[in-house]
Amino acid sequence: MKALNLDDKYYPVGAMIAAISDAKNKLLFASDFRKQARDFYQQKVADVYEYYERELRKNNALDFDDLLLVAVKLLQSNEAVLDKYSKRFRYVMIDEYQDTNHAQYLLAKLLASHWKNIAVVGDADQSIYAWRGADIQNILDFEKDYPNCTSIKLEQNYRSTKIILDAANAVIENNEGRPKKNLWTDKTEGAKIQHFTAQSEHEEAAFIGDTIAKKHDIHGVPYGGYGHFISYECSVSCT
């Protein structure tokens, strides 16, 4: 950022990294991104991207996103390379397919183009990585991309109770474009779900602490019998 005289207060390093990563996941080199930059901020992102790309080339290096971008571009532009590797990989298997981005989707499609033996596992109702480029449409369109495929629904749940699954079904049935399925279990009903909305982080922490203390004092539940899951955000800062 210093090399381009950009103030990281207005152009945070984390935001620049995310924007460049998103562009690469959409198969855009720096020059491609420059052409579609629509406003002043995007022009600055393009400046950073071009500088970063030059530095990578100076060091004969690729970053993680380049491993996908360059591979896809190579397979798309060189028929001999595509023919070699699509024949080499007779079977392509992918887990968590709902979390694939555009570059990963195309790479899989290219590698499976000869034998067309592709098996994917995924759940259209639990895509949570759109913020880093995941495209839910990849799994929703799988049967259109491979019309001769066989789909197997895994609807029995071995982990959760019936009450949990009933609540989950009630929520996910509102998702648009999803393939219909109904989660079920042969476990018992289970404890009722408790829901609490806090007005602040302090109120949330106090509620959790009070609840655990009451369970311990009234029912003798040991403190070590609890687990606390939180959503945590952190920013990337480079000096």
Predicted segments, located by residue:
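Conserved P-loop NTPase-based nucleic-acid remodeling module centered on helicase motor cores
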Residues: 1-24, 28-40, 47
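P-loop NTPase Walker
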Residues: 3, 83, 137, 166-169, ...
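Conserved phosphate/pyrophosphate-binding and hydrolysis machinery centered on Walker-type P-loop NTPases
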Residues: 6-13, 35-42, 61-65, 101, ...
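Proline-centered turn/helix-capping motifs that create local helix->coil transitions or kinks
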Residues: 8, 24-30, 116, 171-181
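Conserved helicase NTPase motor core
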Residues: 38-141, 153-160
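Helicase P-loop NTPase motor core
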Residues: 147-150, 155-239
